[in-house]
């Protein structure tokens, strides 16, 4: 993996030179476009669209379009793209990941390729990590696009389908990865064209691409429906497990995130439940409840892995610290946690539709992304998404100072030192950003700061709504901001305060909204922005004198990239700044990988709790542990993709056929083929032995009569003379006769329905029957595939490759599902024929 990264970087130098040249060419057009009137500049959009309609490609209008958007941004926002931002925009247009340091203006950079690609009229999706950023960027950057005559939409979690449809119809659509992915799944569950909201997957620019395509790639998007009834055993085991003892009744492997029940534990549970054998077939499900209850107790920590809000257990992303709204753990794990927390236990869910983010984003014809830290994942982005990472130079030299890690024996000593350091920094007016790994730790530190009388803001999954306001003020003199991991990522920490966001907050407080009254908002913006910038700049000078933003990490993350992201918040755009990590021997990463060796050494040397050590051994151990975890996570994501690739190919077939049926006015050919293939399959099964006397005609006619009412008597067919002498009937003759008979019987249904409501009526009935059958069979297939995947690992014990077995058996199951769709559809349609006959008989009587 790491060797590939080096190879990828070799070609990067040539790409950067090319981007430098492009940026120079765009800047050379600056005076020409600055001299255009507003009307002339706005007219460029129509001109570009006409040229594209005339046969020109995007690359031919590339430089002029970039120059147009750059000038528009200056007139509307008062911001002009730097040379390096033009380079970043070009990298995005060519379908790369632009690695741009924090504070280099990724949001503004995105305006250029979004405008250019929107000119084709096929839609551009700008993907962010949360609703707030999607709405903010659609409003702020959307002002540039709307000025140039483009429509801008935004997808938010609380929108209705008609609002979503309108947003996707816009030239440029902002939204989160979750909302876009779930809309894709919902579209492929729609029963009519009018229910669809998306219009295709042309070009996506993914902001914080590493967070979305890598950190969240292990968790699939799942739309699920409740399974009837919730088991009482979730509560039963939630009461039993706390009375059990770790390492006596059960064992836990924190590194592998697994649990195992010991013999003493089995005996204890059997005694509590009053049963003789926990592993008896009739009690097999109880083992799953027990394991989940132990995992809920030992491996899932409140305010770290999840939070409880309004009586609901909500998952917290371990990398970003954000709440994963709408997602639930599967296989009963979520219910076990609900039982542990004594909140309402919601029904177990059955998967209705699912897709991984990896496969969702590979739907796009062109994909690009932006991030501040992609170098460590360059190989993965290339292997899985075919994306090259190009490091864009900074606008000014980086002045950040990364101080040596300080390691303490205990958590208490570490946090005491952290508070002392924060107090010292704030006294001289230096702003401090503190990174924690969980909601629990952020709130613990908040309590310590409150006791010391240090004013601060907390930014975690519980305070998600105030994210932008808190981050906008995190660069003020003496400000202290405590954040989980990368909560607040996507919003710049500007020394002295972020003038654009602070002004936006101020204008909204006065009732001005850029969507509802763009003219009034723009007028106030233009009038007040210079004063706000000056005020922030004056405060920023004071902060620079105090040393710039100080970033303090309270624990190393298992991914180096997350640590680098935290450090990257400091020293933006050539500002001064410094960073330091405070560690303890009881930190999760240290416990899992460094082990007791270092702690024993500190004890032998009689190192006091409040005295830190600076050790190369510790630093190297941490780096080794992080590299080990990164490799494990990469392999896990590759493994997820390998297994999902089987489902992905099947999903593409089903969704493609489903969409074709939705869009076709006449699906009679599908139905005719289904009739022929179903009847043929029956005949093939009955005549497999070859000789007429060996055919299982009783079985064949029983199957046919369950399907429809054959008008042919099989005795006449076999013994009659229609096909020559008695006994000369071939399997092909039988198939032809029965297929023709089934078609003739179906024609009677078509005739009967058409007589009532015209030919369109039978076509509508066919669609109304077929779509639910497809959805039901697909849902059942997803369940069967989940079940197959759960047990497929056991095939390794028989010296067989689990993946190969999964591919083979999954393929067989998929073919069986398709046959089931045909058979059930034909059966239901012929059932309508029987109902018509019954009605006719009743009328005759």
UniProtKB/Swiss-Prot annotation:
It catalyses: ATP + H2O + cellular proteinSide 1 = ADP + phosphate + cellular proteinSide 2. Pfam families: P-loop_SecA, SecA_DEAD, SecA_PP_bind, SecA_SW. InterPro entries: Helicase_ATP-bd, Helicase_C-like, P-loop_NTPase, SecA, SecA_CS, SecA_DEAD, SecA_motor_DEAD, SecA_preprotein_X-link_dom. ATP binds at residues 85, 103-107, 492. Keywords: ATP-binding, Cell membrane, Cytoplasm, Membrane, Nucleotide-binding, Protein transport, Translocase, Translocation, Transport. Its EC number is 7.4.2.8. It is found in: Cell membrane; Cytoplasm. It is a peripheral membrane protein. One of its GO terms (cellular component) is cytosol. One of its GO terms (biological process) is protein targeting. GO terms for molecular function: ATP binding; protein-exporting ATPase activity. It comes from the Bacteria. The keyword Membrane applies. Part of the Sec protein translocase complex. Interacts with the SecYEG preprotein conducting channel. Has a central role in coupling the hydrolysis of ATP to the transfer of proteins into and across the cell membrane, serving as an ATP-driven molecular motor driving the stepwise translocation of polypeptide chains across the membrane. Monomer and homodimer. Part of the essential Sec protein translocation apparatus which comprises SecA, SecYEG and auxiliary proteins SecDF. Other proteins may also be involved. Belongs to the SecA family. This is Protein translocase subunit SecA 1. It comes from Corynebacterium glutamicum (strain ATCC 13032 / DSM 20300 / JCM 1318 / BCRC 11384 / CCUG 27702 / LMG 3730 / NBRC 12168 / NCIMB 10025 / NRRL B-2784 / 534). The lineage of its organism: Bacteria, Bacillati, Actinomycetota, Actinomycetes, Mycobacteriales. The gene is secA1.
């Amino acid at each position: 993996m790491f060797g590939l990264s080096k190879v990828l970087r070799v070609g990067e130098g040539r790409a950067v030179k090319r981007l430098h040249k492009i940026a120079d060419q765009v800047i050379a057009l600056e005076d020409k476009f600055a001299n255009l009137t507003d009307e002339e500049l706005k007219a460029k959009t129509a001109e570009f669209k006409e040229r594209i309609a005339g046969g020109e490609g995007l690359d031919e209008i590339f430089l002029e379009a970039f120059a147009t958007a750059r000038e528009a941004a200056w007139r509307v926002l008062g911001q002009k793209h730097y040379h390096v931002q033009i380079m970043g925009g070009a990298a995005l247009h060519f379908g790369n990941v632009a690695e741009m340091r924090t504070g280099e203006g990724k949001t503004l950079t995105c305006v250029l390729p979004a405008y250019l690609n929107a000119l084709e009229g096929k839609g551009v999706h700008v993907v962010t990590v949360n609703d707030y950023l999607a709405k903010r960027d659609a409003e702020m950057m959307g002002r540039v696009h709307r000025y140039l005559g483009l429509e801008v939409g935004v997808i938010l979690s609380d929108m209705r389908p008609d609002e979503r449809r309108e947003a996707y119809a816009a030239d440029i659509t902002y939204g989160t990865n979750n909302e876009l992915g779930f809309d894709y799944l919902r579209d492929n569950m729609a029963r009519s064209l009018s229910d669809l909201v998306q219009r295709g997957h042309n070009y996506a620019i993914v902001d914080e691409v590493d967070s979305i395509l890598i950190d969240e790639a292990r968790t699939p998007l799942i739309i699920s429906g409740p399974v009837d009834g919730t088991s009482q055993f979730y509560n039963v085991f939630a009461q039993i497990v706390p009375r059990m003892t770790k390492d006596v009744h059960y064992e836990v492997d924190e590194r592998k995130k697994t649990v195992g029940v010991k013999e003493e534990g089995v005996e204890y549970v059997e005694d509590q439940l009053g049963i003789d054998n926990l592993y008896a077939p009739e009690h097999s499900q109880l083992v799953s409840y027990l394991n989940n209850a132990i995992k809920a107790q030992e491996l899932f920590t409140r305010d770290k892995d999840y939070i409880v809000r309004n009586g609901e257990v909500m998952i917290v992303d371990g990398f970003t610290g954000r709440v994963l709204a709408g997602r639930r753990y599967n296989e009963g794990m979520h219910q076990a946690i609900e039982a542990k927390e004594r909140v309402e236990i919601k029904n177990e869910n059955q998967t209705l539709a699912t897709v991984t983010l990896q496969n969702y984003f590979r739907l796009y014809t062109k994909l690009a992304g932006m991030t501040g830290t992609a170098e460590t994942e360059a190989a993965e982005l290339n292997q899985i998404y075919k994306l090259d990472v190009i490091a864009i130079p900074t606008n000014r030299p980086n002045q950040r100072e990364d101080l040596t890690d300080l390691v303490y024996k205990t958590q208490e000593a570490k946090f005491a030192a952290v508070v002392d350091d924060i107090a010292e920094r704030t006294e001289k007016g230096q702003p401090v950003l503190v990174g924690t790994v969980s909601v629990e730790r952020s709130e613990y530190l908040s309590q310590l700061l409150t006791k010391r009388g240090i004013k601060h803001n907390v930014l975690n999954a519980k305070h998600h709504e105030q994210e932008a306001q808190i981050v906008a003020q995190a660069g003020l003199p003496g400000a202290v901001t405590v954040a989980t991991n990368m909560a607040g990522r996507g919003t710049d920490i500007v020394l002295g305060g972020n003038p654009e966001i602070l002004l936006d907050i101020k204008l909204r407080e006065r009732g001005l909204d850029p969507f509802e009254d763009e003219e009034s908002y723009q007028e106030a913006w233009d009038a007040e922005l210079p004063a706000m910038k000056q005020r922030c700049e004056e405060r920023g000078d004071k902060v620079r004198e105090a040393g710039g933003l100080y970033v303090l990490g309270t624990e190393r993350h298992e991914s180096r990239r997350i640590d680098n992201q935290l450090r990257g918040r400091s020293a933006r755009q050539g500002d001064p700044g410094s960073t330091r990590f405070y560690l303890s021997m009881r930190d999760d990463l240290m416990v899992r990988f460094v082990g007791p060796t270092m702690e024993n050494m500190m004890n032998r040397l009689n190192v006091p709790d409040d005295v830190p050590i600076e050790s190369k051994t510790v630093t190297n151990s941490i780096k080794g542990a992080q590299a080990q975890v990164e490799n494990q996570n990469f392999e896990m994501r590759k493994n997820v993709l390998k297994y999902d690739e089987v489902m992905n190919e099947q999903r593409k077939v089903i969704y493609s056929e489903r969409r074709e049926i939705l869009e076709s006015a006449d699906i009679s050919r599908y139905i005719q083929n289904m009739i022929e293939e179903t009847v043929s399959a029956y005949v093939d099964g009955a005549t497999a032995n070859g000789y007429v006397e060996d055919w299982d005609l009783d079985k064949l006619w029983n199957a046919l009569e369950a399907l429809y009412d054959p008008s042919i008597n099989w005795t006449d067919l076999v013994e009659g003379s229609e096909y020559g002498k008695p006994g000369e009937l071939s399997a092909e003759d039988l198939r032809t006769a029965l297929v023709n008979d089934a078609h003739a019987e179906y024609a009677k249904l078509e005739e009967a329905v058409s007589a009532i409501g015209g030919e369109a009526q039978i076509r509508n009935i066919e669609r109304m029957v077929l779509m639910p059958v497809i959805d039901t069979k697909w849902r059942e297939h997803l369940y069967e595939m989940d079940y197959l995947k759960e047990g497929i690992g056991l095939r390794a014990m028989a010296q067989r490759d689990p993946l190969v077995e999964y591919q083979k058996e999954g393929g067989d199951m998929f073919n069986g599902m398709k046959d089931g769709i045909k058979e059930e559809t034909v059966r239901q349609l012929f059932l309508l024929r029987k109902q018509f006959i019954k009605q006719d008989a009743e009328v005759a009587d």
